[in-house]
Amino acid sequence: MKKRMLGLLLTAALVLGVTGCGNTTEKKTTEQANGSSEELTTEAGETQNVRLGVWTGGIDHYLAVVGTEQGIFQKHGIDLETTEFASGINTIDAIVTGQLDIGMIADFAGVNRIGNTQDNFDSKIIGRYVTATGWALYVNEDEVKDLSDLAGKGFGTIPGTITDYYVALTYEKAGIAADEQKLVNIDSTQAMLGVVDSGEVVAGWSSGASAKKLEEHGMKKFLTMDDLGISVDAYYVASKDILAEHEDLVEDFLAAIKETEEWIIANPDEAAGIVEDKTGIPKDQAAANIEATTLLLDFKQDSVDHLDAIKEWAVGAGMFEKDYDIKDYVDTTALGKLFPDAVEN
C-alpha cells in the first residue's frame, strides 16, 4: 500500500449544452504498450468546458492546477473551470444541484454517502486517482507504551468520519473489548489539541498539518496505516447523464488526469512550486504531500474489496441500514477504453 487522499461528476445541464458540449472535440487515442497517456492528444482545436469541484488543498486540487498550468487539459480539449470546496463530499452535493460536472470523493465518505442516499445517488465512480497511507496514530507516550494501554483511556475521534473506522480497527488490533473503549468525540484539530493538553485524550489518528500540531503538543507517532494494512483512496465521480450522453468528454478528462499525474511524478519539485504559486500552499508542504502519495488511475478488484471492507464496518456500526453492491455505483467504461489494464477484465 502506498500514500495519500480525493474529485467527481457531470449533470443534465451538460446534455442541454449549458457547459459547452455542443462544441464537439474530435479525439483520437493511441494506446501505448506501457499504459502511458503520452500519445493521447486532442486533434481538434476547440475545447469543451468542464466544471470540476476540488477539495481545497487535496491532491485533486494539485492535479487541477498543475494540469491547467502545463496546458494538459487544453491539449485534451478541455477548458477546465475549477471550484474549491471544504471537503470532497461537498463536490457531490454541488453535482446533484447542477453546479458541477465532475467532483471527488474519498473512500469512507463515499461509502457513507452512497449508503444513506442509495436511490438518489445519481452518480458513478469513474476511477481511483490516488492512494495514500499518510495517517498515523499519535499517543501520549507516558500513558501508552503498548496498544493494550488504550483500554479505559480517552481516544479522540471525529464522529461520522474515517477516524471512527481507524479507531475501531485499532481497538480490534489491540483486542480491547467494547466496555473498555473510551471514545472522546471532537469536531476539529483545535478541539483535539485541547483535550490532549488536558489529558482527557491520550491517543488519536491524524495526518498532515494536524499531525504536526499534535507532535508540537507532545504526542508521538505510534502506529501507521501500513501496520493495519489499510489506505486512504480517493475517486473521481461523474453524473449518469454525462456518462450516457458525453462519454467522450469523460475520456478526455481522464486522459488529461493521467498525463498530469505522469508529469507530476516526473517533476515533483516543479509541481510543488506550481501548487504554491497557484494555491498559496507552501512549497515544502505541497512537496511533502506529493511525496506521501501514490498517483494512479484505475479501478480494479482491490478497489472493490477496499470499499466493501469499509462498507461492511459501516453497516455493522449502524451508519446506514440497507446494504448495497458498490459495483452498482461504478462505471469504468471510459477508463477501460483509454487504459484497458487499469480496470478488471
Regions found by a protein language model. Give the residues of each.
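Secondary-structure end/capping motifs
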Residues: 244-321
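Pocket-lining segment of extracytoplasmic ligand-binding domains
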Residues: 107, 179, 183-184, 188-277
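Bacterial lipoprotein signal-peptidase II cleavage site
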Residues: 18-33
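Sec-dependent bacterial lipoprotein signal peptides
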Residues: 1-19
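Short, glycine-/small- and polar/acidic-enriched structural segments
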Residues: 29-177, 183-187, 202-208, 221-224, ...
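Solvent-exposed, polar/charged alpha-helical surfaces in well-ordered, non-transmembrane soluble domains
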Residues: 65, 70-71, 93, 97, ...
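Conserved C-terminal helix/tail region of periplasmic/extracytoplasmic solute-binding proteins
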Residues: 315-345
